[in-house]
Amino acid sequence: MGLEAFSRSAPLTLGVELELQLVNTNDYDLAPYADDMLRLMKKTPLPGSVVPEMTNSMIEISTGICHSCSEVLGQLTPIRDALVKSADKLNIAVLGGGTHPFQQWHERRIYDKPRFRELSELYGYLSKQFTIFGQHVHIGCPDANAALLMLHRMSRYIPHFIALSASSPYVQGQDTAFDSARLNSVFAFPLSGRAPLALTWEDFGAYFDKMTRTGVVRSMKDFYWDIRPKPEFGTIEIRVFDTPLTIERAAALAGYVQSLGAWFLADQPFMPAEDDYLVYTYNRFQACRFGLEAVYVDPAAGGHMPLRQHILATMDEMASHAAAQGASSALHLLRTEVEAGQNDARWLRERQREEQLLAEVCRQAAQRFRGLAL
């Protein structure tokens, strides 16, 4: 099957997907209630969609096409409210976060869907270990070549996305010392990491054809890249975000992506090059391990600086573009937390230090997802 044509989409439009945890309200471990939630959610007309995910203790929600991060929040809010209402009927809870803090992967069950069964047969235990929870942000691009240019420009900012969204410090009851341990599970898949540097759709199509001829790849879904083109939507899809603990942060992260995209389209600030990727894996590791306390290596100049400093400087650089997109409040929310060194991973660790019980941390995270201030 050849690479499909890149569809038209309005530049800088947004779409957001959130993978969410379903937990019981007894000990707050994961609960296999995806089918029941989907059945109840069908009764409420909502924007976007609600679908199953790899294992039956997960659910994915998504917005429709949005023109601003406030519209993203406007669509996520009724979906969240309907989820909470449905969960209450089932005596379960819904929460964000990139990993469940203490679930045991071997207890998971693959959701009964052909693609999930196929992936389970191919990847074995990795499929159950893939009970992790991410936010994906789609951004509309003017055309196929512009999409590839946008993709490789966004790649310099992967550490920003990781540190700002990091919410997975705990795995199987242990503090991993990572702010985003979730991405360590993605590394195990053979077609993860970065996309190849192709800046025209023709060159990308040639790469895709080579990969399909090997029999390794059948469609774009087989690539688990950090950012990948989504030709049927006319977007690129950024996939490194942990699912935040609140929909407000999820919408703000979408606003951050949109502001970057607006800056790229208006100012063309740099041309991507293969050498950008010399420090890609190192920067990615730093952000996963240390979050906002990471070191960032500038791919162009080679200089080292605190990642937090690079994020704040980037916010200053694109402030006028954020304002034009209606994303100033999103950047303000994120800036305040960056200046305080606060992300969701830190919040989870602070709660655990105080409570000394990860089940109680999950209970409080579920309250935060409901919209209650904690």
UniProtKB/Swiss-Prot annotation:
One of its GO terms (molecular function) is glutamate-cysteine ligase activity. It is an enzyme of class 6 (ligase). GO terms for biological process: modified amino acid biosynthetic process. Gene3D superfamilies: 3.30.590.20. Keywords: ATP-binding, Ligase, Nucleotide-binding. It holds the Pfam family GCS2. Its EC number is 6.3.2.2. It catalyses: L-cysteine + L-glutamate + ATP = gamma-L-glutamyl-L-cysteine + ADP + phosphate + H(+). The keyword Mitochondrion does not apply. InterPro entries: GCL_type2/YbdK_subfam, GCS2, Gln_synth/guanido_kin_cat_dom, YbdK. The keyword ATP-binding applies. ATP-dependent carboxylate-amine ligase which exhibits weak glutamate--cysteine ligase activity. Belongs to the glutamate--cysteine ligase type 2 family. YbdK subfamily. HAMAP family: Glu_cys_ligase_2. This is Putative glutamate--cysteine ligase 2. It comes from Verminephrobacter eiseniae (strain EF01-2).
